[in-house]
Amino acid sequence: MNKIPNEAIPDCFKYSKHAFEGKITKEEARLKIHEELDINFGSARDYYLYYNYLITGNKPTWVLNNYTLGYFLEKILEDYKNDNEQKKKTLLHFKKLIEKFEGEKVGSKKSMRVIYEKYIKLV
């Protein structure tokens, strides 16, 4: 499997957000990520799931790479800059994801904790 370039992540975020907002369907977002960004069709689904999870807390997803984790978290917090409740919920969902994977003994998620600590100080 090829490494997904960091340059593709802003568009992954954009399509995931558009699907969440109902501007396009989840399947359209997945196809755009797959076709336009040349990301594996199966993996393309994870970006929407991660975005949705950070906002709603529904269905925790796979852990994406650190750049993606940080980018999505930062952009969601920017989008909700005037909504402290949503920012707190998003950070809580992120923390629960860390705890979920550590609890499943997937291994230490120190890098995720560093990302969490960076943003929790801002809320």
Task: Give residue ranges: language-model regions.
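Charged, helical or coil segments that form electrostatic protein-protein
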Residues: 68-86
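Helix-boundary capping/turn motifs
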Residues: 20-25, 42-46, 64-69
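Short Lys/Arg-enriched helix C-cap and helix-to-coil transition segments
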Residues: 56-74
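General secondary-structure propensity
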Residues: 26-36, 51
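DNA major-groove recognition helix of helix-turn-helix
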Residues: 48, 52-55
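Short, basic interhelical loop/turn and adjoining N-cap
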Residues: 32-46
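Short, amphipathic alpha-helical "recognition" segments used to contact nucleic acids or chromatin
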Residues: 4-27
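Helix-turn-helix/homeodomain-like alpha-helical modules used for DNA recognition
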Residues: 80-123
